[in-house]
């Protein structure tokens, strides 16, 4: 008997257990859907914080009996709870807006493998049975596909925790007729991807979209001799490297995307900011209603007067109505030097009484105002059992 046989037998047992775990997770999700249907009938909120806290406390106690530490149990079940919450939110939204869950054509930046493609897949997996891909070369093309009916939805990045706002997307939002109908956050783990056996000293050219270069500038500064080549998306960069089959070129992108192009990970890169996330928004031709059982977010676009204190006056309206602003972004108004438009994310349902009062007051004190969309908030803040 070789020394590998006992190890092989143990791995087979682990694989068998993993299959059982997957089946149980799928069964649990089906039950979460049934819970969502019950909440729909009883009109109870999707989130029940007390129930979540009790659940975690009970599981931590049970875990101790099996020598599983509290941190492990908490991390694992917070993720499972988040999945249940988002699954139920999607169910309620489909019912309220009479959305056909069968299939949707979704436009995104780049060919397959881009971060936008991964985000589109994530959104589609929760909302539709079939995802028809529509990769685009530019952000403007994505908006145009949905505006002209070639696609049903657009998924575009809007901000990153490391490199900040995606200005091109904010500028397109100024002029589009589309509405924001959803959001999601994607963890961004950049890798240096190559087409074969090579090492860092052999690389002389790196391809990627401008955003990853910004987010990984500290790492790149260690290799000042590398030539930086910009592409329209991370997937376009991967495509170039895959076609080149050269030990001297690499792409910055995701490991999942690299796998689609047959690339290997040469180096896992820590971004300038350790927790690197990109927030994406989903756009459609028609605005949606958001169930009052679901936490909602409303995005506004407004222009204030140029007099001193105009923006502060507008923000005070939100405070006076106990509305929480989660983001404020400014962009220049093209053709009007020194004038700016402001984008606001507000933690509220558009149809709530306080939001309606605030909109009325804002309409009276701003030069212009537009609701870009009201949509379910997918920021599921985990419950702390302690």
UniProtKB/Swiss-Prot annotation:
UniProt domain Prephenate dehydratase: residue ranges: 105-285
UniProt xrefs under Pfam families: CM_2, PDT
Effect of residue 52 to A/D/Q: Important decrease in catalytic efficiency and affinity
Pathway where this protein functions: Amino-acid biosynthesis; L-phenylalanine biosynthesis; phenylpyruvate from prephenate: step 1/1; Metabolic intermediate biosynthesis; prephenate biosynthesis; prephenate from chorismate: step 1/1
Descriptive protein name: Bifunctional chorismate mutase/prephenate dehydratase
Subunit organization: Homodimer.
Residue ranges occupied by any ACT domain in the UniProt entry: 299-376
Organism from which the protein derives: Escherichia coli (strain K12)
Known outcome of mutating residue 11 to A/K: Important decrease in catalytic efficiency and affinity
Positions with a binding annotation for substrate: 11, 28, 39, 48, 52, 84, 88
Location in the cell: Cytoplasm
Regulatory (Phe-binding), as annotated region: 286-386
Protein EC: 5.4.99.5, 4.2.1.51
Keywords: Amino-acid biosynthesis, Aromatic amino acid biosynthesis, Cytoplasm, Isomerase, Lyase, Multifunctional enzyme, Phenylalanine biosynthesis
Gene name of the encoded protein: pheA
Substrates-to-products reaction catalysed: chorismate = prephenate; prephenate + H(+) = 3-phenylpyruvate + CO2 + H2O
Domain Chorismate mutase residue range list: 1-92
Molecular function as annotated in GO: chorismate mutase activity; prephenate dehydratase activity; protein homodimerization activity
């Amino acid at each position: 008997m070789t020394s590998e046989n006992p190890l092989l037998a143990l791995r087979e047992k682990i694989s068998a257990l993993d299959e059982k775990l997957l089946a149980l997770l799928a069964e649990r999700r089906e039950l979460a859907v049934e819970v969502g249907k019950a909440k729909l009938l009883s009109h109870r909120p999707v989130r029940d914080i007390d129930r979540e806290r009790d659940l975690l406390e009970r599981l931590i106690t049970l875990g101790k009996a099996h020598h599983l530490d509290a941190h492990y149990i908490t991390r694992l079940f917070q993720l499972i709870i988040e999945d249940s919450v988002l699954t139920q939110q999607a169910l309620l939204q489909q019912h309220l807006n009479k959305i056909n869950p069968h299939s949707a054509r979704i436009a995104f930046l780049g060919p397959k493998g881009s971060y936008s493609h991964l985000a589109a897949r994530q959104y589609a997996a929760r909302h539709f049975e079939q995802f028809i891909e529509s990769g685009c070369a530019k952000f403007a093309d994505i908006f145009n596909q949905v505006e002209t009916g070639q696609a049903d939805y657009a998924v575009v990045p809007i901000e990153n925790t490391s490199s900040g706002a995606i200005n091109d997307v904010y500028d397109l939002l100024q002029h589009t007729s589309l509405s924001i109908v959803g959001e999601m956050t994607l963890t961004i783990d950049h890798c240096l991807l190559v087409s074969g056996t090579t090492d860092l000293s052999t690389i002389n050219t790196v391809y990627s979209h401008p955003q990853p270069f910004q987010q990984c500038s500290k790492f790149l500064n260690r290799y000042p001799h590398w030539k930086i080549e910009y592409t329209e998306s991370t997937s376009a960069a991967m495509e170039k490297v895959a076609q080149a089959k050269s030990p001297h070129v690499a792409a910055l992108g995701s490991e999942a995307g690299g796998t689609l192009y047959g690339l290997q990970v040469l180096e896992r890169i820590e971004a300038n900011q350790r927790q690197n996330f990109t927030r994406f928004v989903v756009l459609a031709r028609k605005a949606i209603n958001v169930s009052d059982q679901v936490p909602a977010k409303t995005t506004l676009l407004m222009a204030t007067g140029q007099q001193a204190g105009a923006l502060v006056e507008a923000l005070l309206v939100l405070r006076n109505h106990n509305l929480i602003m989660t983001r404020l972004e400014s962009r220049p108004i093209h053709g009007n030097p020194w004038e700016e438009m402001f984008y606001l994310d507000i933690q509220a349902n558009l149809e709530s009484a306080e939001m309606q009062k605030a909109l009325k007051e804002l309409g009276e004190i701003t030069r212009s105002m537009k609701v870009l969309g009201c949509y379910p908030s997918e920021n599921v803040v985990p419950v702390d059992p302690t």
